[in-house]
Amino acid sequence: MAKKKSKKYLEAAKQVEEGKLYNASEAFGLVKKIDFANFDATIEVAFNLNVDTKQADQQLRGAMVLPNGTGKDQTVVVFAKGAKAQEAKDAGADVVGDDDLVARIQDGWLDFDVAIATPDMMAQVGRLGRVLGPKGLMPNPKTGTVTMDVTKAVTDAKSGQVTYRTDRDGNVHVPLGKVSFTEEALEGNFKAVYDVIAKARPASVKGVYIKHVSVASTFGPSVTLDTTAL
């Protein structure tokens, strides 16, 4: 049974012209205008792609740093030992550890946003797969979070890095910033994300690749973008 929409949502939805494709500037202005959350909500972009995620070469996954940040202070943990652990601390990681950090997470601590690991720690970190995997927190080479360059990884995470991956239906959701951002900042972040997704087109995809793009705030209705204008 479909969840009943709130009165505030329905009022906001009335301001979105049905069937209209908005340019990016119009879309972000409207999303900001119709947001009704009593906090600084996140604005997210959703892509629907013409990909078959059953094919390994058509699964998108990666990371990028948004030019205007995310508006969120990221709590970063690093699994590392010795000199690499010190490097992570110097780079600004919030929590650094090895077996002790693995044990802490096994005991239920998950108060962080990004997890980074050096390759030599992945045997231990792998034991956390069932905990970190479903939350999208498992370190992965494709997102730059399994690396010996922990300084860059921590700096990127603290500077507004976002990750992206296709779900089984070919959708990709990426946060672009907060409602408090200017339209220009949101549009700049969106264009950066759009370029990355467009360039990640698998060679085996035929026909139209990006089928649908929309933006919305946390609780607000979505606004569809005109991809021909991008």
UniProtKB/Swiss-Prot annotation:
Organism of this sequence: Ligilactobacillus salivarius (strain UCC118)
Lineage top rank: taxon: Bacteria
GO MF terms, alphabetically ordered: rRNA binding; structural constituent of ribosome; tRNA binding
Any one Gene Ontology BP term: translation
UniProt-listed Pfam families: Ribosomal_L1
Gene that specifies this protein: rplA
Quaternary state and interactors: Part of the 50S ribosomal subunit.
Official protein name in the record: Large ribosomal subunit protein uL1
Keywords for this protein: Repressor, Ribonucleoprotein, Ribosomal protein, RNA-binding, rRNA-binding, Translation regulation, tRNA-binding
Similarity section: Belongs to the universal ribosomal protein uL1 family.
GO cellular component, one term: large ribosomal subunit
Biological role stated in the UniProt entry: Binds directly to 23S rRNA. The L1 stalk is quite mobile in the ribosome, and is involved in E site tRNA release. Protein L1 is also a translational repressor protein, it controls the translation of the L11 operon by binding to its mRNA.
Database matches in InterPro entries: Ribosom_uL1_bac-type (IPR005878), Ribosomal_uL1 (IPR002143), Ribosomal_uL1-like (IPR023674), Ribosomal_uL1/biogenesis (IPR028364), Ribosomal_uL1_3-a/b-sand (IPR016095), Ribosomal_uL1_CS (IPR023673)
This protein's record includes keyword RNA-binding: yes
Membrane-spanning residues: none
